């Protein structure tokens, strides 16, 4: 029997992931990152977001073979501030950093999966070939394979170099680099540049929008969308109701 795939977009302290995984613990579950730094207007405190991340880590430990945890720009900002300081919890930076470092072996930057005859690439924001070429000092662009990013990330010395490239931010997000990194790419970068990695369907989050999944040419799927999580009208803003994509 084929497993279901459950993809959890940007959490930011929301609780919708709990309903999504309940009863599906043996299915394939992939979190797209950004667990911390909640939106103030949603009524979620940094403390609540920290607790959700603790529980997500515990969920991963209970189901290590089925659950993949990817990191987003907000999470990585606690490991390297040059990557992101947006909405960062200044008071608890050291605590958040320690939680991530203590469990760093549980996290990846990218995940490559086979589904039928297709190869699907999961990441926080999507992978552009322009970003790879811009960082050819780090990546073997002629023989690149996505798993190379994780290999560098899990090497303590290599991680320092990777963090330099992960801090790349394009003009679409207020930066000056030719391309956003795999944790910073805005979906409009794909729309205007048509430089996604060939041979893959990519599924990512990062670019928040209302409605359902944002699909480009059937092979780029942005899931950081309003239909994935919706505040219950009768509850306070920390109560989240899971919706089907």
Where are these regions (language model features)?
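Conserved N-terminal structural segment that caps and organizes enzyme catalytic cores in eukaryotes
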Residues: 104-114
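Active-site environment of divalent metal-dependent phosphoester hydrolases
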Residues: 13-16, 37-39, 74-80, 128-130, ...
């Amino acid at each position: 029997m084929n497993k279901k795939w459950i993809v959890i977009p940007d959490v930011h302290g929301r609780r919708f992931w709990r309903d999504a995984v309940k009863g599906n613990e043996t299915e394939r579950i992939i979190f797209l990152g950004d667990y911390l730094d909640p939106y103030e207007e949603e009524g979620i405190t940094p403390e609540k977001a920290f607790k959700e991340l603790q529980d997500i880590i515990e969920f991963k430990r209970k189901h290590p073979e089925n659950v993949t945890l990817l990191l987003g720009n907000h999470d990585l900002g606690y490991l390297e501030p040059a990557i992101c300081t947006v909405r960062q919890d200044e008071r608890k930076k050291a605590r958040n950093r320690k939680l991530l470092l203590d469990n760093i072996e549980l996290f990846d930057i990218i995940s490559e999966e086979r589904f039928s005859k297709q190869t699907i690439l999961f990441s926080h924001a999507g992978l552009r070939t322009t970003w790879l070429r811009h960082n050819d000092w780090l990546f073997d662009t002629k023989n690149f394979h996505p798993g190379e990013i994780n290999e560098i990330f899990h090497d303590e010395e290599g991680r320092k170099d990777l963090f330099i490239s992960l801090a790349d931010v394009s003009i679409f997000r207020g930066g000056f680099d030719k391309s956003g990194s795999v944790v910073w790419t805005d979906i409009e970068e794909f729309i205007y540049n048509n430089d996604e990695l060939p041979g893959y369907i990519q599924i990512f989050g990062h670019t928040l929008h209302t409605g359902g999944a944002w699909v480009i040419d059937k092979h780029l799927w942005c899931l950081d969308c309003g239909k994935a999580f919706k505040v219950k009208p009768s509850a306070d803003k920390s109560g989240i109701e899971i919706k089907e994509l």
